[in-house]
C-alpha cells in the first residue's frame, strides 16, 4: 500500500471561506447511492466547488472507462450491511480495478454506521482503496480516526490512526457533517491544486 501519500487533514487548519474556485483540471466524482445520502454529499461537493470544476457520475449507469478521462478523482463509497460494497460498486469496482490507473490522484469519502455496524464501519473505503492502489492509483487525503467509536474497520490504513478517506455517519453523527466537510474541502483545494478567489 505504498501508493498512499502523506497528505492529510491533520495539517489543514484554515476553513474554506470563499465560494469561487478555479482549477486547471476537471475533477470527477464517482458515487453509488441507494438511500440518497452519498448522492447528497456529492451534490454538495459540486455546489461548493462549482459545476465548471466537478463532474458527477453515478456508477450505476457510467462506463468504467470514463475514469480514464480524469487525473483528479473523488470516490464516494458507502458501506452496506456487514462490510459490503453498495450494490452498484459491486459491479463497477472490478471493472475500474482492471484499468491502468497510474497517474490518477484519488481522494475518497465513505459513509457508514459506527453503532449499528461497529465491526464493519467504513469497510468499503478499504476495499475500494486497496483495489485502486493495485491498479496504480495514488490515494490522497487520509482522514484521522479520532472522534469515531467503532470496533473494527477495513477502512483504516495500516497505521491504525487514519482512514483512507473522510468518514461520515448519517445515522449517529450527522451534526458533525458540516465541520468535517469544511476541513475536507480545505484539503481538496490543496491536493487538487484548486485556487480560490
Residue map of PLM features:
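Short, flexible active-site loop motifs that bind/organize anionic cofactors or intermediates
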Residues: 28, 57, 171
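FMN-binding flavodoxin-like domain, especially the glycine-rich phosphate-binding loop
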Residues: 1-25, 37, 48, 52, ...
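A short beta-strand-loop structural module common to alpha/beta enzyme folds
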Residues: 52-63
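N-terminal beta1-alpha1 ligand-phosphate binding loop
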Residues: 27-44
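Short, surface-exposed acidic/glycine-rich loop or hinge patches that mediate macromolecular interfaces
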Residues: 32-36, 61, 79
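Short conserved loop adjoining the S-adenosyl-L-methionine
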Residues: 66
Amino acid at each position: 500500500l505504498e501508493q498512499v501519500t502523506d497528505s492529510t487533514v491533520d495539517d489543514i487548519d484554515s476553513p474554506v471561506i470563499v465560494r469561487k474556485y478555479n482549477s486547471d483540471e476537471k475533477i470527477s466524482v464517482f458515487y453509488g447511492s441507494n438511500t440518497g445520502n452519498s448522492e447528497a454529499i456529492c451534490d454538495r461537493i459540486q455546489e461548493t466547488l462549482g459545476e465548471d470544476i466537478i463532474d458527477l457520475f453515478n456508477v450505476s449507469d457510467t462506463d468504467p472507462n470514463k475514469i480514464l478521462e480524469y487525473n483528479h478523482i473523488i470516490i464516494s463509497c458507502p458501506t452496506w450491511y456487514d462490510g459490503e460494497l453498495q450494490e452498484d460498486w459491486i459491479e463497477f469496482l472490478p471493472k475500474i480495478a482492471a484499468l491502468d490507473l497510474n497517474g490518477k490522484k484519488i481522494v475518497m469519502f465513505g459513509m457508514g454506521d459506527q453503532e449499528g455496524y461497529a465491526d464493519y464501519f467504513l469497510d468499503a473505503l478499504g476495499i475500494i482503496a486497496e483495489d485502486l492502489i493495485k491498479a496504480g492509483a495514488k490515494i490522497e487525503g487520509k482522514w484521522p480516526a479520532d472522534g469515531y467509536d467503532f470496533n473494527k474497520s477495513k477502512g483504516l490504513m495500516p497505521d491504525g490512526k487514519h482512514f483512507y478517506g473522510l468518514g461520515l455517519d448519517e445515522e449517529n453523527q450527522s451534526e458533525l457533517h458540516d465541520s468535517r466537510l469544511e476541513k475536507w474541502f480545505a484539503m481538496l483545494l490543496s491536493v487538487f491544486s484548486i485556487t480560490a478567489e
